[in-house]
A protein has these predicted regions:
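An acidic intrinsically disordered interaction segment
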Residues: 1-6, 101-111, 133-141
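Short, motif-level signal for alpha-helix interfacial/capping segments enriched in acidic residues
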Residues: 2-7, 91-93, 148-151
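Hydrophobic helix-and-loop "lid/oligomerization" segment in the mid-to-C-terminal part
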Residues: 2-24, 30-64, 71, 76-85, ...
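Short hydrophobic "helix-edge" motifs at membrane interfaces and signal-peptide entry regions
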Residues: 17-18, 104, 160-162
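Short acidic, glycine/serine/threonine-rich loops at helix termini
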Residues: 32, 61-64, 100, 122-125, ...
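Glycine-rich, phosphate-binding/catalytic loops in enzymes
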Residues: 36-38, 103-106, 129, 186
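Active-site cofactor/cluster-binding pocket
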Residues: 67-127
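Short alpha-helices
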Residues: 115-187
């Protein structure tokens, strides 16, 4: 760890301009880790730019204090697309970067900080720290840069800590997922000691729903189907649902959270239509390795929670995914 820390700080110190980025469809771990790391990099005397796709990230506005430097990939001018250092968070594969992979490929040096198993299209980096034992990338950042964080001005330090606490909430589902271990609670307690208020962060992250968003969730839940001896839960949402309720689905929590814990369910499969013929798939399971399924479709994640995209009709997606999930369950059950 000491050698990793030293190399990380040295690469940042030598960089002229730094790119921060994460996987497609950024979540509370990848995106908020990037926000936190950008502020730490600024404290270390360097500037950086956080680049995402055109996703709606407004649900994280409560964290913002007006100091973050961010741009969407589509907004970058040609002269802004060259970086001396690219830092990729919560992702270790070019396949998971979308269009932004060209920015990373062109960078003079690359750092990868991730807690997923190594995937296809592995990014070749000067420094690659991929450690699945960590619950979230935020935990990796804190473990590497805790000393610097403790030296930051109070306001900036609190910003960093709130962002890092959000990475815990996102990837442990508020300390209930199987990846919640002793180290996670130690990490969280350190953040609380530095000023984080857990009740506030929980409320901001999980409880900010409009009536329209809840109607959308209700319509999604009404599509629930049970398959394979009631062990598989399948549900979906469509563009028509989001249009009817005048919401952007990206601005709310993944709908799988509303159905976790149903008795007898071993796998949750949720399809959300992003645009015509394109579905974002979320897979959850306490038994089978859903990451293996997601990887087949160019996605990835963790053993118990993974995602990918499907290009085709809802019927085609449902048919293929259910076959894959049933096959995985049959193999698991022998």
């Amino acid at each position: 760890m000491q050698n990793i820390r030293k190399e990380l700080v040295e690469l940042i110190a030598k960089a002229e301009n730094i790119l921060l980025t994460t996987h497609i469809s950024p979540d509370g771990d990848g995106y908020c880790s990037a926000l936190a790391l950008q502020r730490i990099i600024s404290f270390l005397g360097k500037s950086s730019l956080l680049v995402t796709d055109d996703d709606d990230l407004s649900r994280y506005n409560y964290l913002q204090d007006g100091k973050s430097q961010e741009k969407r990939f589509s907004e970058l001018k040609e002269e802004e697309q060259n970086f001396s250092l690219a830092i990729v968070l919560d992702c270790n594969s070019y396949d998971r970067l979308g269009e932004r992979c060209v920015l990373v490929e062109k960078a003079e040096k690359i750092i990868v900080l991730d807690h997923h198993e190594a995937e296809n299209g592995l990014i070749k980096a000067e420094l690659s720290y991929i450690e699945p034992s960590f619950a979230c990338v935020g935990e990796i950042i804190f473990s590497l840069l805790e000393t610097a964080i403790n030296k930051m001005p109070v306001s900036d330090r609190l910003f960093v800590c709130n962002c890092l606490y959000t990475t815990i909430l996102n990837d442990t589902n508020n300390f209930v997922n199987a990846n919640t271990d002793t180290d996670v609670f130690i990490f969280a307690s350190k953040l609380v000691n530095l000023g984080v208020k857990p009740n506030e962060q929980y409320r901001y992250f999980f409880l900010q729903h409009s009536a329209e968003e809840l109607r959308y969730i209700g319509e999604t839940l009404s599509t629930i189907e049970l398959h394979y001896q009631r062990k598989i839960l399948f549900m979906y949402s469509t563009l028509a649902m989001s249009k009817k309720n005048n919401i952007d689905p990206e601005s709310i929590m993944n709908a799988t959270r509303w159905v976790q814990g149903i008795i007898g369910i071993e796998v949750i499969t949720y399809l959300r239509e992003e645009k015509e013929g394109v579905y974002k798939i979320s897979l959850r399971s306490e038994t089978i390795d859903v990451n293996r399924i997601a990887v087949r479709y160019g996605g990835g994640g963790h053993k118990q929670a993974a995602g990918c995209y499907f290009y085709g009709t809802l019927a085609e997606a449902k048919d293929k995914l259910l076959k894959d999930v049933i096959n995985a369950l049959e193999c698991y059950n022998g």
